[in-house]
From Swiss-Prot:
Gene3D superfamilies, sorted: Thaumatin (2.60.110.10)
InterPro entries in alphabetical order: Osmotin/thaumatin-like_sf, Thaumatin
Keyword flag Nucleus: no
Species: Phaseolus vulgaris (Kidney bean)
Protein family: Belongs to the thaumatin family.
Protein name from the UniProt record: Thaumatin-like protein
Alphabetical UniProt keywords: Antimicrobial, Fungicide, Secreted
Main location class: secreted
SUPFAM superfamilies documented for this protein: Osmotin, thaumatin-like protein (SSF49870)
Length: 30
């Protein structure tokens, strides 16, 4: 998964790689 995510954002990449905890930074909400 390094083609469409890379085009999105930097936080979206790690968010998608996470099991569910990464969904919290879906919009960059720290």
């Amino acid at each position: 998964a390094n083609f469409e995510i890379v085009n999105n954002c930097p936080y979206t990449v790690w968010a998608a790689a996470s099991p569910g905890g990464g969904r919290r930074l879906d919009r960059g909400q720290t």
